[in-house]
Regions:
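Extracellular/periplasmic carbohydrate-active domains that bind, remodel
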Residues: 19-402
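Bacterial Sec-dependent N-terminal signal peptides
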Residues: 1-24
Length: 402
C-alpha cells in the first residue's frame, strides 16, 4: 500500500512539473516569412509576433525560430509605434521591423539570419517583457545614411580636397551641394569621422571634423573636388564617414523589461545607437556586437552614436564576449536622466522638466522610487532622499511629481 501511494505521489508531481515547464515552439516560416530577395517581411512578422504573444503563459517557455536566411523589412507596411527613446530624436510614429511586446519566457532564435532594413526603421524592440532571450541574428540597412568617401588628393598649398564616393552611396550634386539619398530620405552631411585607410583607426587627434560638401565640382562620376575644404590631417587614402546629426532610432530598443539576454547579435549599422535600453532591469549582453562584417568589409563605420546605451536601468548590466567598433561615440554608456525643478507647487509637490530635446516623453520614475535633489551648479546633494507617491505628465516635457 505504501509503495502504491508513493508511486501515485511521484506520478502527480511529474505531471504537475511537466505542466509548469512546457515549451511552445513556433517556426516563423509557417507565418509567411520568406528569405526571398525584395520580399517585405514586415507585415508577416508583426502579425506573427502578435499571435505568439497571446499564447505566452507564466509557466511556459516560448521558442520562436527564424530559419536561417536573409530577410528584408520595408517601412511602408511595418508596425507603427509611438516610442519615446532616450538620447534619440523624438520622431513618431516609428516603423518597427520586429516588435516584441508583452512577452514572457520567450526565446527568439534567428539561427544566424541576416535582417536587412530599408528606409528609416527601428529594427527590433522589446517592451514590457520578462525573462526573454534574443539571439543569433544580425541587423543591417540596405542604404545607410552615412556617406563614405576616400580622399584622393589634398592640395595643402592652394587648398581643396578631391574625394571619391563609395560605390554603394546614392547621391547627387544639387546646386553644387552634396545630397545623400535613400529610400524615403535625403540629407546633406554636416560632419564626419576620419579613419586611416590602412588601419581603420581614427585619424590621430580628430573627433568630429567639418566636411566640405558645398561649392563642389564633380570631376567625373563619384570623383568630386571640394575647393573650400581645407584640412591638412586628411592625407590621400583617408576614409571619411560623412553624416548628419539626426538620430531617429537605435538598432535594438529595450523598455520596461526584466531579465533580458541578447546573445550572438551583430549590429552592422543603425542610424542611432546600436542598443538603447531604458527603464529595464538585469540585462546580459553575451556576444552582442556592434561591428563590421569582417576584415573585408568595405565600410569603415557602424552606428551613428554609441554602441550600447543604458538609461535609467537597474540591477546587473553585463557585457561580455562582444566587439564594439566603427561607432561614432561610446562603446558603453550608463546614466540616468535629471529633471530640472521649474515650479514648486507646495511642500510635497513640484513640476520637473526634461531639458534636452532627445530626452522627454518616456517614463522618468514610478511610485515608490526614491528621488535625490541635487544642486545643479555644484552637483552637491540637497537634503535626504525622498520617495515618489504620485506622478503624472503635465506637458510634453514636464512632469508633476508628489
Amino acid at each position: 500500500m505504501k509503495w502504491y501511494l508513493w508511486g501515485a505521489v511521484v506520478l502527480l508531481y511529474s505531471l504537475f512539473g511537466s505542466a509548469c515547464s512546457t515549451e511552445g515552439r513556433y517556426d516563423l516560416s509557417a507565418y509567411g516569412l520568406s528569405p526571398v530577395e525584395n520580399v517585405d517581411n514586415a507585415p508577416a512578422m508583426a502579425r506573427a509576433l502578435e499571435q505568439i504573444r497571446e499564447k505566452c503563459e507564466e509557466n511556459q517557455t516560448i521558442v520562436v525560430t527564424l530559419p536561417k536566411g536573409r530577410y528584408e523589412f520595408y517601412p511602408d507596411s511595418a508596425a507603427e509605434r509611438v516610442y519615446f527613446i532616450s538620447n534619440h530624436d523624438q520622431m513618431n510614429p516609428k516603423k518597427v521591423g520586429l516588435p516584441f511586446e508583452g512577452m514572457k519566457n520567450m526565446v527568439f532564435d534567428g539561427q544566424g539570419s541576416e535582417l536587412i532594413f530599408h528606409g528609416r526603421m527601428l529594427p527590433v524592440s522589446l517592451l514590457d517583457s520578462r525573462n526573454c532571450v534574443l539571439k543569433n541574428f544580425s541587423i543591417d540597412f540596405k542604404h545607410p545614411q552615412i556617406s563614405q568617401v576616400k580622399v584622393v588628393e589634398n592640395d595643402t598649398v592652394n587648398g581643396g580636397i578631391t574625394f571619391e564616393v563609395a560605390p554603394w552611396v546614392h547621391y547627387e550634386i544639387r546646386d553644387s551641394v552634396f545630397v545623400a539619398k535613400g529610400e524615403g530620405w535625403e540629407l546633406t552631411p554636416g560632419s564626419g569621422i576620419a579613419f586611416e585607410g590602412d588601419t581603420r583607426h581614427l585619424v590621430y587627434n580628430t573627433s568630429d571634423i567639418p566636411v566640405g560638401v558645398r561649392g563642389l565640382i564633380e570631376v567625373s562620376p563619384r570623383l568630386i573636388k571640394s575647393p573650400r575644404w581645407k584640412d591638412n590631417r586628411l592625407v590621400p587614402g583617408t576614409v571619411i564617414a560623412m553624416r548628419s546629426w539626426e538620430r531617429p532610432a537605435p538598432g535594438v530598443f529595450l523598455y520596461h523589461d526584466v531579465n533580458t539576454t541578447l546573445e550572438n547579435i551583430k549590429v552592422h549599422y543603425a542610424e542611432g545607437m546600436g542598443l538603447l535600453a531604458q527603464m529595464s532591469e538585469n540585462i546580459t549582453l553575451d556576444g552582442f556586437s556592434v561591428c563590421l562584417k569582417g576584415a573585408d568589409d568595405p565600410r569603415y563605420f557602424t552606428t551613428q552614436a554609441d554602441a550600447t546605451h543604458f538609461s535609467a536601468c537597474k540591477g546587473a548590466i553585463i557585457s561580455k564576449n562582444g566587439l564594439y567598433e566603427g561607432m561614432m561615440d561610446d562603446a558603453i554608456n550608463v546614466h540616468g536622466t535629471y529633471l530640472k525643478v521649474v515650479r514648486r507647487v507646495n511642500d510635497s509637490t513640484l513640476v520637473g522638466r526634461y531639458m534636452h530635446p532627445q530626452s522627454y516623453g518616456f517614463e522618468w520614475g514610478r511610485v515608490g522610487d526614491s528621488v535625490q535633489f541635487i544642486h545643479s551648479s555644484t552637483m552637491e546633494l540637497i537634503g535626504a532622499r525622498n520617495r515618489i507617491t504620485e506622478g503624472r505628465r503635465s506637458s510634453r516635457s514636464g512632469l508633476r511629481i508628489r
